[in-house]
């Protein structure tokens, strides 16, 4: 069996990072995103300055303010977070289509079969971190390992803004010293039961047979045995049906005018064509669209039914979209809405039986 290469990407205090990016005066101060204390709100996330005071996610805002009286609490802006998440996933898709989102700010990537960087998962993770930093001005932590269980642990190993790699030959020694509380699925109740049995780390777990663990923990005992040996065969689940295919680029220097934007279209269109070829037979292309993000982070998206997907059509859309802001542009994107042909195929199979 080919050795898998799994990357786990986790944004660092994601919501708070977006707020500090968009409101630079918040940076360096204790900050939380959540509901107001007056309305019994809770903390969704907070930056590391706030965590130094003991502020944590899911804590009541009132309690958080007692721990940190200087804490600034801002309301969540979900659309801003979703947009940032979409930009990050657009970066992911430059390396692999095997992406399993866990939330807006966290995902697994299977890069086992990619040819980027000669197949080096470590270099891919480094490049993703670089691009997210340059394009979105936030940081992500990454873990690289032969499976999902270890990749997720690795991404947390050097947080924030870190990269940790567990190579196949390091798995046995690395896992042996792991506390059982690090194992996927082990909560307080299971950890307490393991502790009563004298099991505090994976080396202790390895001393027990699979049968003994199954007797104590039922079917989960088999899972415990596998994790203690660094085994996790769960695939990266990529079952979502795509609604569009797109390509976008954030430019190191803002594009000053419409002419500069139009010059970038041919390269974007070529990349879009390559991505569409990979999905041939799965989707029917629909409306073309363009996305423009201006230098002040305001943005607009414009699509048109019945328009072509040639360079001229995208030039017309871009011209109209640019006119909505008329300011220097930091990001350009183009794409196509998709209609899933697999649903139609499944219906045909259903009625042909």
Curated annotation (Swiss-Prot):
Chain residues that bind Mg(2+): 10, 105
Catalytic residues of the enzyme: 106
Listed EC numbers: 2.7.7.7
Position of the signal peptide: none
Assigned keywords, A-Z: Cytoplasm, DNA damage, DNA repair, DNA replication, DNA-binding, DNA-directed DNA polymerase, Magnesium, Metal-binding, Mutator protein, Nucleotidyltransferase, Transferase
Catalytic class of the enzyme: transferase
Principal place of residence: cytoplasm
Sample GO molecular function, one term: magnesium ion binding
Keyword Repeat: no
UniProt subcellular location: Cytoplasm
GO process terms (BP): DNA-templated DNA replication; error-prone translesion synthesis; SOS response
Catalytic reactions on record: DNA(n) + a 2'-deoxyribonucleoside 5'-triphosphate = DNA(n+1) + diphosphate
Cofactor(s) in the UniProt record: Mg(2+)
PROSITE patterns, A to Z: UMUC
The keyword Signal appears for this protein: no
Gene Ontology terms: cellular component: cytosol
Residues covered by the UmuC domain: 6-187
Function in brief: Poorly processive, error-prone DNA polymerase involved in untargeted mutagenesis. Copies undamaged DNA at stalled replication forks, which arise in vivo from mismatched or misaligned primer ends. These misaligned primers can be extended by PolIV. Exhibits no 3'-5' exonuclease (proofreading) activity. May be involved in translesional synthesis, in conjunction with the beta clamp from PolIII.
PANTHER family registered for this protein in UniProt: DNA POLYMERASE KAPPA (PTHR11076:SF33), DNA REPAIR POLYMERASE UMUC / TRANSFERASE FAMILY MEMBER (PTHR11076)
Subunit field text: Monomer.
Similarity-based family: Belongs to the DNA polymerase type-Y family.
Name under which the protein is recorded: DNA polymerase IV
Gene: dinB
């Amino acid at each position: 069996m080919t050795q898998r290469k799994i990357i786990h990407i986790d944004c660092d205090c994601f919501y708070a990072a977006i707020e500090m990016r968009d409101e630079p005066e918040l940076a360096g101060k204790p900050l939380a995103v959540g509901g107001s204390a007056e309305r019994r709100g809770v903390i969704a996330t907070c930056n590391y300055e706030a965590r130094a005071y003991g502020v944590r996610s899911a804590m009541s805002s009132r309690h958080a303010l007692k721990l940190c009286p200087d804490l600034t609490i801002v309301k969540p802006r979900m659309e801003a977070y979703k947009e940032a998440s979409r930009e990050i996933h657009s970066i992911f898709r430059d390396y692999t289509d095997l992406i399993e989102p866990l939330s807006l700010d966290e995902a697994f990537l299977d890069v086992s079969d990619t040819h980027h960087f000669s197949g080096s998962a470590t270099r891919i993770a480094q490049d993703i971190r670089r691009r997210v930093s340059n394009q979105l001005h936030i940081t992500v932590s990454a873990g690289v390992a032969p499976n999902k269980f270890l990749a997720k642990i690795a991404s947390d190993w050097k947080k924030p803004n870190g990269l940790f790699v567990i190579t196949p030959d390091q798995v046995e020694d690395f896992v042996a010293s792991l506390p059982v509380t690090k194992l996927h699925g082990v909560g307080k109740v299971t950890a307490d039961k393991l502790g009563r049995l004298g099991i505090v780390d994976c080396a202790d777990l390895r001393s027990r047979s699979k049968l003994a663990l199954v007797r104590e923990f039922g079917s989960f005992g088999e899972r415990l045995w596998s994790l203690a040996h660094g085994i996790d065969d769960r695939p990266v689940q990529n079952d979502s049906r795509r609604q569009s295919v797109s390509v976008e680029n954030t430019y190191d220097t803002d594009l000053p005018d419409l002419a500069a934007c139009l010059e970038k279209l041919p390269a974007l269109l070529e990349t879009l064509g390559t991505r569409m070829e990979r999905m041939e037979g799965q989707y029917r292309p629909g409306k073309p669209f363009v996305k423009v993000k201006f230098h002040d982070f305001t943005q607009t998206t414009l699509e048109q039914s019945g328009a072509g997907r040639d360079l001229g059509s995208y030039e017309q859309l871009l011209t109209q979209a640019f006119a909505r802001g008329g300011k220097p542009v930091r990001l350009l994107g183009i794409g196509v809405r998709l209609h899933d042909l697999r649903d139609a195929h499944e219906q045909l199979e259903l009625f042909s039986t």
